[in-house]
């Protein structure tokens, strides 16, 4: 399994996985603008998953924006490998904390992040019936 930063030519595959994974997919133009923050995982020559993250708060905190794995490659540790690789990169950059926002109805994502060591630090009430959970992990 190879993990590397995305390139322009990878965006079509990212969009394909995006559309298979989320009811409201981000479009090509937006993904192109943030492509430096996309990490891909390959199985041979095939892109089978991605993680999008960004840094904020004077580059001491990072945020996971999205993680998605192609349906044919799910439950194989790909998302876990992407998060572990991101943590290595962030540690090298002296980033001390990473957070993620997860909707309360997405129990698999909540369990995934808890297994990775994230802790729920707050609940963000929404006008809809679904609340958001802010989860954080201290790095290093």
PLM feature spans:
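Structural preference for beta-strand elements that scaffold enzyme active sites
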Residues: 61, 97-99
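Conserved glycine-rich acetyl-CoA-binding loop
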Residues: 67-84, 93, 103-111, 115-116
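C-terminal "cap" of GNAT-fold acetyltransferases
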Residues: 39, 96, 103-110, 115-116, ...
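Short secondary-structure junctions
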Residues: 3-4, 117-121
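Conserved N-terminal entry element of GNAT/NAT acetyltransferase domains
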Residues: 1-9, 137-140
